[in-house]
Amino acid sequence: MSEDKNNPTKPAESGFGADDDRYLRYFDAEMRYLREAGREFARSQPQGARRVGMTMPGARHDSVEQTYEGFAFLTSRLRMKLDDAAPEITDPLLDHLWPHTGRTIPSLTILECVPRTGEARILDTLPPGLQVRSTPVGPDGTICVYRTTRAIHLLPLNVREAGARMREDGRTVIRLAFDLLHREQRLVDDLSRIRLYLHGDRPTASALYAVFTRQVESIGVRMPRLLDGQLQPRPAMTIEAAGFGAQARLWPTDLDVRDVDLDREQTMLEYFAFPEKFHFVDLCGFDAASVPPGETRLEFEIVIRDRIPGDVTFCADNIRLFCTPVINLLELDAQAIRPNAHDRDYPVHAPASAGEHVEPYDVLSVVATDPRTARQYPYQSIKAFRHRGGMIRHESPDRYYHASIRQGVTGQREMVVTLGGHLWAEPGSLPDGHVTVRVLANNGRLPRMALRESMVTTPASTFNGVERVHNLTAPTMPLYPPRGGDYDWRVISHFNGAGTTELNMMDANVLRGALSLYDWTRDDDNRRRIDAIHYVWLDEETERVGARVDRIVNVNVGIEPSGFAGPGDVALFGDVLSRFVGRYACFHFAVRLVLYEGVGGPSRRYPCTIKTGDWL
């Protein structure tokens, strides 16, 4: 039978709102299945089919049609109930084990901080978590709050010039010139790591990323007051990518250990959601003590091996200092919970004063308050595994909570807090009558295009030494995990056995399917990048390291470069993919990505990834 009743399709555009009724999709799928099954039964058992009226000429007998409809009604209701109940099991499981697969990705943008000039500078580092506000958004004039995700090191530098030129010997040189400020405080400056943001459209920014991370051959420095401005080689200086690793995570995480374990998967999710996050590089190794007194200019000459990918051009506007990603998250107290003796699950709602567009993102704390004594009793998160039980049943807290994201009655995502613990174990017990929940929230329910039009220009926290702030990129729209279908089961299968099942079946379709789990944007450009993977195969090699022999599995991936925004975009995709396939490494073998660009094009062997940490 050709009909697949496990994947109900939309009914035809007829009748009473067929496109809007979910139940009709199940009902029509069951009816199609029953009719086709009836035809097969009539062919295989003609006498039995004749007795029940299934082979009568002309229209099908009313009794047969009514039987079909009654059976389809019951089974479609049952199937819809099962499909509706499955997320109640799978969604909390995903949120607990792999939280990045089930949480909203709030709006993101790149923020630039402009330091104060004309006064004595206070050497400072701006910590992550500082808040900035947007201009009024939407018809109600909602102001969105963003927070910085990384620390910003303020340095006495201004970008004066940037560009590429050809030397007399035919080598391409990138020149970065900075103004040195506040020379009276030069001795306390630390210029050993200068962070640069590569600003521009995707082909330009990714081409600069590829140049700085792959093609640097040597770095020299010129200072007008030193040796009459002659070039001084600095072999110890390097340029490193600054957008990778758990320390560069865009969103807050529950546990640092789990964040490190899931770094490869979260990096792929960040790549599709906000690629600008990877357009940061660090100029490392410059010694500020070598700057002579009174120097006002610092110029770096970077010799690269080949031409800039795509022959893109750039200027000082493409090299920015003091930038960081910011995310639309704010802390607030949710509406108080009034527990009763019958329920354990309570929805978490933002206060009315925050606006109707605010939705909870994560729970920070849950506290019960005794109204008679004003004494507070904190709840422990079940994710910390400190709830009462086992050998520590006499020492653990009496209260714990579990927060999860579920699909509400209206189809929107809602946060639910489950209260439990030893004090709640007895039937009918009500240990607390007033519970407050502190949450992280975002403006995810704003009209989606309204966020794209906002500007982030107003500091809401103290930015020491900063004159003004503004966003360099348009804020992204919030992204939600895919709903419906088999997304939850695909995620569970993806992480099953630490990816060994996926590796054993690895081919182009499997890899494309794995990457599609991390693309929530529905963007045609991202879809083309995934579809550009044409073939995948595995081979094995051994490598002798000292007295041991390492076994290495090579994941060979062939891509079509036309699916990307230039050679630089291919380079960034390769770096992210190399990190991602490292998830398949285990204690029996290491994993290496080998990337082939087109037919007869260049190939690149990436460093192999070796399993570290626990056995599981």
Regions found by a protein language model. Give the residues of each.
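Extracellular ectodomain segments of secreted/surface proteins
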Residues: 63, 75-82, 100, 161-171, ...
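Short, surface-exposed linear segments at secondary-structure transitions and domain or protein termini
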Residues: 154-159, 247-251, 460-471
